[in-house]
């Protein structure tokens, strides 16, 4: 019997959204004038497994909501504001909140992105994963990092050991078919990685780059 693939990142939201095999997700942007923007994520069977709503649906800037295919809320993402954030000249701060069994919000990750748009294109973005439950005695594997260009649909999400746990790509045939690489692209998720967490990070990248979730 073959060895099972090692899990590089503990489930951030739920083990339910991971797979023992590599998974290719298809991201399709929704027209802002029809559906309020955002995007939907389908699996290889063309079944919608995630939906992301942004400003056009929620009516609030700096707020994103990830739902599963059944429409249940999975992850609420907020761009932090206030005086302290305004005084930070280097980074914007984002926080992702999952929900416990009683529907109470719990902080699951924190992301900081450069305020300088040039740095967004050329530097990595680090995410602190708070875990479920939060890890106290060890910080190992509590970080993931995004490297590459999301705008060009050529970026990797890496674990703390530098191994890719997900990739954003667009096939040449797909680009020729849709004409705009931003409208339809692939997210390739490695085995035993929480796909809902990965899609949550994609939602923030989409917003940072002024795409379907912004208004």
UniProtKB/Swiss-Prot annotation:
Q: Which family does it belong to?
A: Belongs to the LOR family.
Note the InterPro entries from the entry.
Answer: LOR, LOR_sf, Tubby-like_C
Keyword rRNA processing in record: no
PANTHER family, per the entry: PROTEIN LURP-ONE-RELATED 16, PTHR31087
Put simply, this protein is called Protein LURP-one-related 16
Residue positions of covalent lipid attachment, annotated as N-myristoyl glycine: 2
Q: Does the keyword Lipoprotein apply?
A: yes
Name the Pfam families on file: LOR
Q: What does this protein do?
A: Might be related to the phospholipid scramblase and tubby-like superfamily of membrane tethered transcription factors.
What keywords appear on the UniProt entry? Lipoprotein, Myristate
């Amino acid at each position: 019997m073959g060895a099972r693939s090692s899990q590089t990142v503990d489930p951030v939201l739920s083990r339910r959204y991971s797979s023992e095999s590599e998974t290719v997700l298809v991201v399709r942007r929704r027209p802002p004038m029809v559906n309020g923007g955002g995007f939907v994520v389908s699996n290889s069977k063309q079944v919608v497994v995630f939906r992301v709503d942004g400003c056009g649906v929620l009516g609030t800037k700096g707020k994103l909501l990830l739902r599963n295919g059944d429409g249940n809320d999975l992850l609420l993402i907020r761009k932090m504001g206030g005086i302290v954030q305004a005084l930070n000249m280097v980074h914007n701060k984002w926080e992702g909140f999952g929900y416990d069994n009683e529907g109470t919000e719990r902080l699951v990750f924190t992301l900081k992105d450069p305020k300088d748009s040039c740095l967004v294109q050329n530097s990595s973005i680090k995410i602190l994963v708070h875990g479920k439950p939060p890890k106290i005695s060890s910080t190992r594997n509590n970080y993931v990092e995004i490297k590459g260009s999301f705008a060009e649909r050529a970026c990797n999400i890496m674990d703390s050991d530098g191994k890719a746990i997900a990739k954003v790509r667009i096939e040449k045939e797909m680009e020729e078919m849709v004409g705009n690489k931003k409208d339809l692209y692939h997210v390739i998720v490695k085995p035993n990685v929480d796909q809902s967490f990965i899609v949550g990070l994609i939602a923030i990248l989409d917003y940072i780059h002024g795409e379907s979730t912004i208004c």
